[in-house]
């Protein structure tokens, strides 16, 4: 489905990997002969333009304040007090998906945690230490999505990351806190919702503290 065959992937020992990447030290690894690096900004713009050609409209900066449901349709009222009426809604709002689901009175027993991934651009003297993407074995098996890797970008830069800085909302791109009400609401969700058990997980607490300091 992703364009790879069994011949494209192999398990190599440390000596075999050393021949391909002299600066890499490991016991063994999965080696893939094919890889891709994507400029996600260009990809997003291309998909957006294609969608617009097919008469799809984008409503930017329209946060959903609340939802009104009738027997026939759904009215979504946005932060600017405009309204969108639909008879079928697909919720694929990324980090805001759970919040929107709750406006439909769904998944009330669930809560979520948000992390911001940050990348470091490697200096020129170390950018070419390896020629390919390197993914490490997760330090915390329960949270394999929070381990950094070595990435060769489409623009030629080499980056190391991401880390996973805990933040209060999906839009906290440059700070830790967007606003106090959001923070208080998130704390309440954590304490009363399904994520409260993470507060007793020593691996999770250790990971969060290290990532915050990074």
What are these regions (language model features)?
Residues 10, 14-19, 37, 111-116, ...:
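Flavin (FAD/FMN) cofactor-binding core of flavoprotein oxidoreductases
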Residues 14-22, 44-48, 65, 93-95, ...:
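Low-complexity, flexible helical/coil segments
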Residues 28-32, 81, 201:
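Short amphipathic alpha-helical segments at helix-loop
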Residues 155-158, 163-214:
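Contiguous C-terminal substrate-recognition/catalytic subdomains in enzyme active sites
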Residues 1-54, 59-60, 66-72, 177-194:
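Flavin (FAD/FMN) cofactor-binding and adjacent substrate-gating region
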Residues 67-179:
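Flavin-dependent oxidoreductases
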Residues 34, 80, 207:
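Charge-dense, low-complexity intrinsically disordered segments
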